[in-house]
Regions:
Chain A
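Transmembrane alpha-helical segments in multi-pass inner-membrane proteins
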Residues: 235, 246-311
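Cytosolic-side transmembrane-helix boundaries in multi-pass membrane proteins
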Residues: 1-27, 215, 219-222, 292-339
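Inter-helical junctions in multi-pass inner-membrane proteins, predominant
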Residues: 35-45, 92, 150, 156, ...
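Transmembrane helix-bundle core of multi-pass membrane transporters
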Residues: 130, 134-196, 223-226, 245-254, ...
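Single transmembrane alpha-helix segments in multi-pass membrane proteins
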Residues: 26-31, 39-94, 125-132, 266-276, ...
Length: 339, 499
């Protein structure tokens, strides 16, 4: 007996479907271009590439579990990165020795996470206390966060960090890329949070039926605030990874990641109406998307065509899901009484 | 039989309807003659709504034959049915509150005339004709939202007449009406019948409309269990046919003398909903609160649990003030609330049965770092499900797979696991089958025997009489009457409710 939501055997779960898809995309790309796709260099470069948007997808996942969404993740990531970058350039600078620069790096990371938490608190308050629809609240706040980042930088990139900063995004630990380790830890943490804690169960139940959560005396405002704060902090973590990999911070980095993060969460089986979502599904969806993306790169598909493909894929996946688990969705949207 | 069928306006034969394995209707024959008034009686879940949906073309039947207006209707949808003269007036009337009376009455007619331009004078004329037909005067230009309930119903009837209705189906027509308004409605029904318009009353409280009806049809569990001239039925025999048992339930045993006051409500008021609410609830007492639809009973129930913030007044439990307008404060003060609408307010339908119970006890079972002690939590929830005799083959299955009665017990289990001091039950047996209903009543009696204060809010008078020690009657947001549960009959209570 488990506390794991809907009961189904693994082979019939959406996660199993995703495993098949991920494997299929991998095999397909390997067959198309075996020497390039399967090369060690390509595999390593993929492992460095995906964690940044994968972490954004985790942020998207937890908000979608409540039936909400966070469109401000990229804005939060950039604002946090800009603040961290300003600390690192103004107070530390590129010449600084390793020892003291590590202290400043720690300080910059803490500041970035605080910015993420504060941004999440703003989003959560808009949703919980003012009752704004999350999609509009975070669309607006995302523009505000981006605007703040532009105001701080004048729109240009901030660069000139101590050498230690590059470590986060570009080094490997025991052969595993650091960003990948970071993503692994965050994904595991989110998985445990959602499945093993009282908070996680409240998030799922709130997503399944917000009104019933209110009637069951769940403190729904607190749940929403926490969810958006966690999403904000995940977004700022992604911002730090982006900053380290680019060795700079700018207000408009990663703008294509927003759609990608939404796509991954939906592809990962997270119910955009709330109440269902598993981190393992999101991880598998991330892998599929990275394989696909690298493959398209090697086939020299243009960036514009890629955005088009992402958009089509997002709609396609949602249509598929609505047929497969559609009954559940519509039963909640308008309960049918039989008598 | 076939001879009757020749002239009948509605002639259904052997109607069977199955939803995903559940048989909602099972071989039902049903006829309505022109100008005839028929009572369609049955408890919630008996299949009467399904039958109406089939006649009005909303649901397709699984087996059987439908004739409307003397023609076979192998294909039926709401448009065809309406064109044949079948009009349904739902309980909420489906009017446009922001439009005027005449616009509401003439709207459908004007649409179906397929003219591109809207003719205001024509619309007013249509509306006036319809009102004249039932002999009622209502200002044509008033917005519908400002009308009292009884007038809204009349507007709905006129809309049906304006669309050339030959059969008007009225869903729960009297639940929101006072006795005087019911009498006027009956007068109008008589006029309609003289005009050759047939009427079907759908209700679980039919005593009021028996006198204008020719025929009564009773459904139970999807089958027709009784049919006959209305003169052969009375309240008691209807209840017998609807429930399938002679059932004076055992009334509650007396509250032990000297029981202490559990809950105290002083001067609770909310603009537009209720005012001057004062009562005390003793340990082990079951307090019934009743009133017509719109009397403020549900708003009051929600206010007691903090879901509606009252403008003034106080609520005390065990002598301590409870912050109003905050369900979490109410919950921690020991108040539990089982809502009226299980499907939207009570349950997390897609989630497992065990989770639906455990959500009430997360604080108790979360250890260090907020991690849940899952096995203890599941064990406790399973224990409560067993105590309340929830029939579930698998407690990890989604709660939507359960029947209404079992679902209600899941909500009850959630609250009972929190050991509440006061439990508020709003419509505890709405949409549950007869057997479960009796079980829920016996659970209520057990709870009061354990010293829990129970508030039952319901418009089901036999239910209140079977469970409550005291009954408060509400009208227009005020408590107008207080009666001891064992001192009144159902008729007296109904009279006090609607006089």
């Amino acid at each position: 007996m488990t506390v794991q939501g809907q009961k189904m055997s693994f082979t019939r779960s959406p996660e199993f479907r995703l495993l098949i898809i991920a494997c299929a995309v991998f095999v397909f790309m390997s067959l198309l271009s075996p020497d390039r796709f399967l090369s060690g260099q390509n595999l390593t470069s993929m492992a460095f590439q995906f964690p940044e948007f994968a972490i954004l997808a985790l942020a998207m996942t937890i908000t979608m579990m409540t039936g909400g969404i966070d469109l401000s993740v990229v804005g939060v990531a950039n604002l946090s990165a800009v603040v961290a970058a300003l600390i690192l350039t103004q107070l530390a600078g590129p010449e600084m020795a390793t020892g003291p620069s590590l202290i400043w790096l720690g300080f910059a990371v803490a500041a970035a996470l605080c910015i993420g938490a504060a941004a999440g608190l703003v989003n959560g308050s808009l949703v919980a206390f003012f009752g704004l629809p999350p999609i509009l609240a975070t669309l607006g706040s995302g523009l505000v966060f981006t605007g703040l980042a532009i105001a701080m930088t004048g729109g240009s990139a901030v660069m000139g960090f101590p050498a230690t900063v590059a470590w986060i995004g570009n080094e490997s630990l025991l052969g595993v890329p650091v960003p990948l380790i970071l993503f692994g830890l965050l994904a595991l943490g989110l998985h445990l949070l959602l499945t093993k804690t009282a908070f996680g169960l409240r998030v799922t139940m709130y997503g399944a039926n917000p009104l019933a959560a209110l009637y069951a005396a769940v403190n729904i405002n607190r749940v929403l605030l926490k969810v958006y704060v966690i999403a904000g902090m995940l977004a700022s973590s992604a911002g730090l990874v982006i900053m380290s990999r680019a060795n700079s911070a700018k207000a408009d980095y990663g703008s294509s990641y927003l759609l990608l993060a939404v796509l991954i969460a939906v592809l990962g089986g997270v119910n955009p109406y709330g109440g269902y979502g598993r981190v393992i599904g999101v991880v598998l969806a991330v892998l599929s998307m990275q394989f696909l993306s690298s493959g398209l790169n090697m086939l020299q598909v243009s960036n514009f065509a890629r955005e088009l493909i992402w958009g089509v894929l997002l709609i396609f996946v949602m249509v598929i899901n609505s047929n497969a688990i559609g009954r559940g969705f519509f039963a909640r949207a308008k309960p049918t009484k039989s008598s | 039989m076939s001879d009757v069928g020749e002239h009948a306006f509605i002639d259904l034969a052997g109607i069977t309807k199955r939803y995903a394995g559940v048989t909602a209707l099972d071989g039902v024959d049903f006829t309505v003659q022109p100008g005839e008034a028929v009572c369609l009686a049955g408890e919630n879940g008996s299949g009467k709504s399904t039958l109406i949906k089939i006649i009005s073309g909303v649901e397709k039947l699984t087996e059987g034959r439908i004739r409307i207006g003397g023609k076979d209707r192998p294909v039926l949808n709401p448009r065809i049915s309406a064109a044949a003269g079948v009009m349904v007036i739902f309980q909420d009337f489906s009017l446009f509150p922001n439009l005027s009376v005449y616009e509401n009455i003439a709207f459908a007619t004007q649409l179906s005339a397929h003219r591109r331009l809207y003719e205001r004078d024509k619309a007013r004329e249509i509306a006036r004709e319809a009102l004249d037909r039932i002999g009622v005067k209502i200002d044509l230009d008033v917005r519908v939202e400002s009308l009292p309930v009884a007038h809204k119903q009349l507007v709905a009837i006129c809309r049906a007449l304006a669309s050339q209705a030959k059969l008007i189906i009225m869903d729960e027509p009297t639940t929101a009406l006072t006795e005087k308004e019911v009498r006027r409605l009956l007068g109008i029904i008589r006029r309609l019948k003289e005009d050759g318009v047939a009427v079907i009353f759908v209700s679980h409280k039919l005593a009021e409309v028996l006198e204008v009806s020719e025929k009564v049809v009773v459904l139970r569990n999807g089958k027709k269990v009784a049919e006959g001239p209305a003169s052969e039925f009375d309240t008691q025999s209807l209840a017998y046919h609807m429930t399938g048992r002679e059932m004076p339930e055992t009334p509650p045993s007396a509250v032990p003398a000297g029981a202490k006051t559990l809950m105290r409500v002083d001067n609770l008021a909310k603009q537009g909903s209720f005012a001057d609410i004062n009562f005390e609830l003793n340990a082990g007492e079951v307090l019934g609160i009743t009133g017509l639809l719109g009397s403020g009973r549900t708003s009051l129930a929600k206010a007691l649990f903090g879901l509606v913030a009252p403008d003034r007044g106080s609520i005390q439990v065990d002598g301590r003030d409870v912050a109003t307008g905050d369900p979490i404060a109410a919950c921690y003060a020991g108040i539990g609330y089982v809502p009226e609408d299980r499907l939207t307010e009570g349950l997390f339908l897609s989630q497992s049965i065990v989770r639906n119970v455990a959500i009430g006890r997360l604080d108790k079972h979360s250890g260090s770092g907020g991690f849940l002690k899952a096995s203890a939590m599941i064990e406790e929830a399973a224990g409560w499900l067993k105590r309340l005799k929830v029939k579930a083959p698998d407690i990890d299955a989604p709660v939507q797979s359960l029947s209404g009665g079992n679902q209600q017990r899941v909500v009850l289990a959630r609250w009972l696991s929190r050991a509440p001091r006061v439990l508020i039950l709003n419509g505890p047996s709405v949409g549950v089958d007869v057997g479960s209903k009796a079980d829920i009543h016996s659970i209520i009696r057990d709870l009061s025997a354990e010293g829990i204060g129970v508030i039952v809010i319901s418009d089901d008078l036999p239910e209140l009489l079977a469970t409550s020690h005291r009954i408060l009657v509400m009208r227009d947001g005020r408590v107008t009457d207080e009666v001891a549960g064992n001192s009144v009959t159902e008729e007296e209570l109904a009279h006090r409710l609607a006089s």
